[in-house]
Amino acid sequence: PGEPGRQGMKGDAGEPGLPGRTGTPGLPGPPGPMGPPGDRGFTGKDGAMGPRGPPGPPGTPGSPGVAGPSGKPGKPGDHGRPGQSGLKGEKGDRGDIASQNMMRAVARQVCEQLISGQMSRFNQMLNQIPNDYHSNRNQPGPPGPPGPPGAAGARGEPGPGGAPGFPGRPGVQGPPGERGLPGEKGERGIGSQGPRGPPGPPGPQGESRTGPPGSTGSRGPPGPPGRPGNSGIRGPPGPPGYCDSSQCASIPYNGQGYPEPYVPEGGAYLPDREPFIVPVEPERTAEYEDDYGADEPEQQHPDHRRWRRALRPGPGQ
């Protein structure tokens, strides 16, 4: 047989076939995760005042107040009625003149002492009398003797209410009350559309998930055959090779080998025909790699899938 011809030039790409039918849409994906809570809304208007609750329990009595200042001393009592005159004594014997003068001096001294004692007591009582018009003393005088208990006075008028006491301690929380009867269903209210709220914050970035592949579309009509390529560069002839089974008999198999070469009964095996020379594809040059894929439409397949597409078996292979 003659030498294999040169590899022809790559033919022009055929026209693209008609697009297949659109596959059925895939099943809807699962619902996405729940978004973050929105901002807090505006505070609503205050409701109507509720009914007045029952009065609470009375608070603990307040602490006793501070003792007030001591009052002014009372006015002196009225002078008592003069007592009855005593009985007249018997007339004594007439004494000597010297003794009479001595008795007079003693009597005068006793009278002066009595009068001075009464005057000092009277002055002391006068000093205790308050005098709002001519009193210049800032310090109260000494307390006077206790007067006789007076008669019970009339019942006084009720005094003004005292100042409010300090707030008592909060009471212990009572047990929860029984559940009330269900109220009647109110009439249906007529609501009006409120103002539009501010836009919420942007949600988290969604995850792109590949859906299930759609059904395969119908096969388009085959394109016109490409033009025949030019003959390629002639490759170097390969060495003729064949396998002699007698040379493989001495190779150990599972740890065991033949002690001497194996010779079949019919003699050594020789091939009936000449060895078939397998053509070897020459290495691609830089110009061939630059021109590869130039005649194909752009963006038909991603760059990382171009060689994968070339490795797929074509129709009829």
From Swiss-Prot:
PTM: The triple-helical tail is stabilized by disulfide bonds at each end.
The protein, known as: Collagen alpha-1(XII) chain
Entry's localization field: Secreted, Extracellular space, Extracellular matrix
Job of this protein: Type XII collagen interacts with type I collagen-containing fibrils, the COL1 domain could be associated with the surface of the fibrils, and the COL2 and NC3 domains may be localized in the perifibrillar matrix.
Spans annotated as Disordered: 1-99, 130-317
Keyword Glycoprotein: yes
Region described as Triple-helical region (COL1) with 2 imperfections: 141-243
Stretches the record annotates as Triple-helical region (COL2) with 1 imperfection: 1-97
4-hydroxyproline: modified positions: P143, P146, P149, P158, P164, P167, P170, P182, P199, P202, P213, P222, P225, P228
Sequence ranges of Low complexity compositional bias: 16-25, 63-73, 205-219
Motif (Cell attachment site): 94-96
Record carries keyword Disulfide bond: yes
Acidic residues composition bias: residue spans: 288-297
Keywords noted in UniProt: Cell adhesion, Collagen, Disulfide bond, Extracellular matrix, Glycoprotein, Hydroxylation, Repeat, Secreted
Subunit structure: Trimer of identical chains each containing 190 kDa of non-triple-helical sequences.
Biased composition (Pro residues): 27-36, 52-61, 140-149
